Amino acid sequence: MADSSESFNIATSPRAGSRRDALTSSPGRDLPPFEDESEGMFGDGVVPEEEEDGEELIGDAMERDYRPISELDRYEVEGLDDEEDVEDLTASQREAAEQSMRMRDREMGRELGRMRRGLLYDSDEEEEDRPARKRRMAERAAEGAPEEDEEMIESIENLEDMKGHTVREWVSMAATRLEIYHRFKNFLRTHVDEHGHNVFKEKISDMCKENKESLPVNYEDLAAREHVLAYFLPEAPAEMLKIFDEAAKEVVLVMYPKYDRIAREIHVRISHLPLVEELRSLRQLHLNQLIRTSGVVTCCTGVLPQLSMVKYNCNKCNFILGPFFQSQNQEVRPGSCPECQSFGPFEINMEETVYQNYQRITIQESPGKVAAGRLPRSKDAILLADLVDSCKPGDEIELTGIYHNNYDGSLNTANGFPVFATVILANHITKKDDKVAVGELTDEDVKAIVALSKDERIGERIFASIAPSIYGHEDIKRGLALALFGGEAKNPGGKHKVRGDINVLLCGDPGTAKSQFLKYVEKVASRAVFTTGQGASAVGLTAYVQRHPVTKEWTLEAGALVLADRGVCLIDEFDKMNDQDRTSIHEAMEQQSISISKAGIVTSLQARCTVIAASNPIGGRYDPSLTFSENVDLTEPIVSRFDILCVVRDTVDPVQDEMLARFVVSSHIKHHPSSKDIANGDAAEFALPNTFGVEALPQEVLKKYIMYAKEKIRPKLNQMDQDKVAKMYSDLRKESMATGSIPITVRHIESMIRMAEAHARMHLRDYVVEDDVNMAIRVMLESFIDTQKFSVMRSMRKTFARYLAFRRDNNELLLFVLKQLIAEQVTYQRNRYGAQQDTIEVPEKDLVDKARQINIHNLSAFYDSDLFKMNKFTHDVKKKLIIQQF
């Protein structure tokens, strides 16, 4: 028996060798078949002589060979087990048996290969002709790799030469696939970083510790080591990734031989693909190629089981057919039963069928990247295996995958002609956050930002840079600037989350640029979603569940607050929302999450965003004789969730109105499209004067400054004056109870802390100092006093004058007091004479008395200041009058 098996191997292996040599470029490729080679090695005269004098098989003695011999006509009893019952093998037993047979055949082929090389080729000649092969064999031997298929490694010397084939055809060839397989396997084994550490040994170890099946591979590393593979990969990703997965699985099993019990497959995930395509730029030339795109997840299905390797039962004979490997494009079904030759029916064998996880998501272009007037495009993506649940609605992700097309009958019905739907088969997903944006800053940008932060008046410069095309409204600009920088979120012990975002509500008369402020923030913020209260429902703001029109499954769709995660959500016409819709954002504004429990989907989505809303008062105009809560149609729970309330009144002030008109006309002249004086529109914008009296920052610099500060600066509260905040809170509570205006709650303490952190972050400070606390108290007080009745507003300003005077020079305070005196005089003249005169006179003594109340005793500097003259005031020393001419 042993002899017969040896003769069988010797007879069959040359045929296998000749078949394998046909694929190789080895020196023996053009030689005749193996049988002919071995005959020619015994000399020219021997073979013809054997052919002539050979034994004649057909003759008279032919029947003697068929005579009965009792000893040889019986089978040997040893080794036979016919009497035992033979059971059917299970799938796992069969796989183990086939694995052992493959290993045995591999071992025998290896021994046979060594014999054949020694028989056919001279060793010296081989070393001269094939030095590369010997070097590669030595490297593999040093790595301890098995020597199987050594001939096949040399099948293609020049992988770049595709011999006129396309990349997909070239990669599909057996010899090319084997060369790619070995090159990638060698890359995984030997790639090291700049410190000499083995990169993938650590990655594989981490992957196996977490029982995962995804091995991330940096495309840039692959291109540096194996540029040919990096060239083939985007052109034929499906074929290349299949080879990569097989090579990665073998490398993993060498390190962890039994890991296939945990993960049946190992998937190579390609990251850092250099070219990023926009969703709206995907065309037919990208079909079946590896692409990288980004967007916001707007919709995702549940995790479904997808058939991976399916087996069928024949209902007539109960024979098990399969396994059939299912592809993404079509369903593979058996045609007929090989046992009973029937054509069905067949049903899926649930026990032996292998499934894999399947999830479908929809990604949409990020809100900040869509051009004005364009609708955001969206695209479906399929997540398989351990990629499922790696993202949820509202997450901004970078997606690397294969751009596929598939047949969609509903599209053909709708369009009337055959078209294909497109989908991205995901390979790698990365969640984007602010760190990615900061990575876009250059070293020069960082140096310029740090240098700017050392300017003593950087706070005023940033306030002046907010909406430079809008005149005045310093309190709104200050509040929006603090909201853009934001405070620091806290989550002590991972149990109770305290938000760090600052919410702002603008309320006031029509025509006071409320919507313009929102539009400006939309352009400056790195991620902003703009919506209106009239056009936004409760589910449009939060999230909703709907049934997919084609698949009929429930999907989770994200609303505006979820899409604005880690950004800004801008809501115009906030008062036009009905109460039911408005209450839906209570949780989003304070807990910064949205809980969903609909149609069997129970989940919680992140809504970590700043809410900036604008509303109009009841009746159209703000009535200063009423409190804030009486002027707006908003409930106390929603008002208390706003940190800063900005009340904008359209008061008649001839001097201010004239300055505003001059500013608007100047702005229109400088920003006209056909203006020849200034080529750059941004330069014209910054040339406009501002009421802060400092130079504003360019808008691009401001964006980078905010981006850097939000990501890199984490201000702490170690050195904060706690007593001052506590005293301020108790005073505000007392005044609130006395006046009956907006209620002061514990949320306002947190608001002051958030504003102090935002002011510290604005100056790139790591700790909150006293100046930050004073600015937070000033903004809080201005917000609180503006919401009072006009009758109590003046007394409250006098009560909190020392807090309101922070960061204001004496000239500003005196100008404010003088304007109040002028307004009183104008009211007196109208009531007495029925009309306002062109000249208003105020006794100097009245201004001196008011100035002493705020501890200002010397007014000469104020009389000489530009601020005094700019507002058309003159000082008559002889008459001791202050005169304003209109």
Swiss-Prot record:
Q: What is its EC number?
A: 3.6.4.12
Tell me, in one coarse class, where this protein mainly resides: nucleus
Extract one GO cellular component term from the record.
Answer: MCM complex
Any Pfam family: MCM2_N
Q: Where is the composition biased (Polar residues)?
A: 1-12
Q: How is it modified after translation?
A: May be in a phosphorylated state in the mitotic mcm complex. Phosphorylated in the interphase mcm complex. Phosphorylated by the cdc7-dbf4 and cdc7-dbf4b complexes.
Keywords of the record, alphabetical order, are:
ATP-binding, Cell cycle, Chromosome, DNA replication, DNA-binding, Helicase, Hydrolase, Metal-binding, Nucleotide-binding, Nucleus, Zinc, Zinc-finger
Enumerate composition-biased segments (Acidic residues): 47-58, 78-88
List localization entries.
Nucleus; Chromosome
Q: Tell me, which GO biological process terms does this entry list?
A: cell cycle DNA replication; DNA replication; double-strand break repair via break-induced replication; mitotic DNA replication initiation; premeiotic DNA replication; regulation of DNA-templated DNA replication initiation
GO MF annotation, one: 3'-5' DNA helicase activity
Function of the protein: Acts as a component of the MCM2-7 complex (MCM complex) which is the replicative helicase essential for 'once per cell cycle' DNA replication initiation and elongation in eukaryotic cells. Core component of CDC45-MCM-GINS (CMG) helicase, the molecular machine that unwinds template DNA during replication, and around which the replisome is built.
Family assignment from sequence similarity: Belongs to the MCM family.
Misc. comment: Early fractionation of eukaryotic MCM proteins yielded a variety of dimeric, trimeric and tetrameric complexes with unclear biological significance. Specifically a MCM467 subcomplex is shown to have in vitro helicase activity which is inhibited by the MCM2 subunit. The MCM2-7 hexamer is the proposed physiological active complex.
Q: What is this protein called?
A: DNA replication licensing factor mcm2
Species name: Xenopus laevis (African clawed frog)
**What lineage does the source organism belong to?**
Eukaryota, Metazoa, Chordata, Craniata, Vertebrata
